[in-house]
Structures are given as structure tokens and as C-alpha cells.
Amino acid sequence: MKRDIHQWISDYGVSHQNPINKKIHWICVPLIMFTLLGLLSLVKIYNVNLAYLIIAFALFFYLRLSTPISIGMFIISATQLGLIFYIEMLFLDIHLIYIYLLTFIIAWVGQFIGHKIEGQKPSFFEDLQFLLIGPAWLISFIYKKIGIKY
């Protein structure tokens, strides 16, 4: 059975009930996304950075599930890519790969600490697509708060 966005969000939420784990996710999920895009932006394929290609595939995934979620993810992705571009312009002489990688690792350690507190394995152990659902899960809370149906 194909899952809709509500089923994905609900299934993801099962292992994200603990308030501390939720708070950790609000910090670590955006950091993981940002640092992953930062790392991917350093990889160029025919003068196109890999982050753009990965975002295109991710947005297609979101669009198949929910137009409002895909719009939110587009805005977040574009904002993060813009910030990454700005950082890369400012710090040409600094090896950003090490900063991105260290932050990426620290954010993942935070995620695993949150799941240890939760007493549940991360959702992506069940299905790798949950790695894309984490950011959408956060957006769903924002949308509910401001009354946007997704």
C-alpha cells in the first residue's frame, strides 16, 4: 500500500513522542539537512553542484506526497542553499568540508541521543525514505500551527 503524507508523518511520529527527543529533532534535523547540502555543494558534476540534483529528486518525492509540503521544502531548501552559497563566498580560504562534516556528525550524535532517550530506534532503520520525512514532519507542525492543510 502506498503511503500518503499523513501516513508518513504519523508513522514517523510513532518514534518521536518524547518531548526531549522532539526538541533535539528541531535542532538536529535542520542542521543535518544544512550540513548535508553543504557537503554536497562541494561536489561538482559538470559545473553543477550535487546539492541541486539531490534537492531536485527530494522535491519530486515531496511533490508526489503533498503540494504544500513540497512548497515548504522548496522554500527551506532554497534558503539553505542560498546561505551555503553565501558562506562559500565569504570563506573561500577555509576548508568548509571539515566544518560541515563535524557539524553533520555532531547533529547525528544528537539524533541518536534523542532516540536513546525516546527508547525507540530511528525511523529510517525501517525505511530510508524516512530520512526525507524528518524535515516534512517538522513542517507539518508549523503548518498545523498556522492553519495550512497539507
Model-derived regions: residue spans:
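Membrane-interface helix caps and helix-loop-helix hairpins in membrane proteins
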Residues: 19, 45, 63-71, 87-94, ...
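Alpha-helical transmembrane segments of multi-pass membrane proteins
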Residues: 58-62, 81, 103-111
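Hydrophobic, membrane-inserted alpha-helices
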Residues: 31-37, 53-61, 77-84
